[in-house]
Amino acid sequence: MRAQDHAISSVKAKLQVRRLNFYYGRTQALKNIELSIPERKITAFIGPSGCGKSTLLRTFNKMYTLYPEQRAEGEIWMDGENLLDPKQDIALLRARIGMVFQKPTPFPMSVYDNIAFGMKLFERLSGAEMDARVDGRRHPGPLWNEVKNTLRQSGICLSGGQQQRLCIARAIAIRPEVLLLDEPCSALDPISTGRIEELISELGHEYTVVIVTHNLQQAARCSDYTAYLYLGELVEFGETQQLFMKPAHQETENYITGRFG
């Protein structure tokens, strides 16, 4: 009943998940996940609370290593490297795979220093090079138009929506290969949500973006591909339009039509 191999043969895969299982202590949260995430596309993870969406997302940059009782088994490949190899440099991995969380997390420093923070950690840039990277020409228009006149203002003084867009700018400033978004709009009003969605759509042209969302309309609007998870299993994965209009599994149809969830 569950799909076993969800590779998208017509596009290049950036992340390849193979036989992935995940545990919180003795509780298994992900069960034998097989999935290929297309490069420079937007992939949405949907499903009811507790289905494993965020857990799967956080295996990509090994956020779980912060908690000793959590562990992953299997393989996640990116550009010929198994990201679950214990020899992986976690700091560099998280530079390659950026992440934005549900609640905005601006640092208590200026907008400029927020955006430059990662560059100072991972790169040796001159002041002029740093200024050029922070410059708005490096960021999507909707973001830059709001913060260009407040670079010396504290990031924590921005509105909630602006703070979240600042966190996205901070994540992409170090030029990651993949951007993970864990319910980035759940704490925002509809107008701020619309602006974030516009920004996500722009980012999808340059980055491999993976977003977890409870908002089915958001998944339908923003993503190129969608994965539906239930009870730790990957039920269905495919092009978003196809999955929403003509899902291959009854369970998927029940969820997206509101009969279940």
From Swiss-Prot:
Q: Which PROSITE patterns did the record assign? A: ABC_TRANSPORTER_1 (PS00211), ABC_TRANSPORTER_2 (PS50893), PSTB (PS51238)
Coiled-coil annotation: which residues? none
Biological-process GO terms, alphabetical: phosphate ion transmembrane transport
Entry's SMART domains? Answer: AAA
Q: How does it sit in the membrane?
A: Peripheral membrane protein
InterPro entries xrefs: AAA+_ATPase, ABC_transporter-like_ATP-bd, ABC_transporter-like_CS, P-loop_NTPase, PstB-like
- Top-rank taxon of the source lineage equals Bacteria
What is its subcellular localisation? Cell inner membrane
Keyword Cell cycle among UniProt keywords? no
Give the Enzyme Commission number.
7.3.2.1
Q: Which residues bind ATP?
A: 47-54
Q: Which GO terms describe its molecular function?
A: ATP binding; ATP hydrolysis activity; ATPase-coupled phosphate ion transmembrane transporter activity
A Gene Ontology term for the protein's cellular component: plasma membrane
Listed under catalytic activity are: phosphate(out) + ATP + H2O = ADP + 2 phosphate(in) + H(+)
Q: What class of enzyme is it?
A: translocase
Annotated ranges, domain ABC transporter: 15-256
Q: How does it assemble?
A: The complex is composed of two ATP-binding proteins (PstB), two transmembrane proteins (PstC and PstA) and a solute-binding protein (PstS).
The entry's family comment says: Belongs to the ABC transporter superfamily. Phosphate importer (TC 3.A.1.7) family.
Q: Give the protein name, as stated in the record.
A: Phosphate import ATP-binding protein PstB
User: What high-level taxonomic lineage is stated for the organism?
Assistant: Bacteria, Pseudomonadati, Pseudomonadota, Betaproteobacteria, Burkholderiales
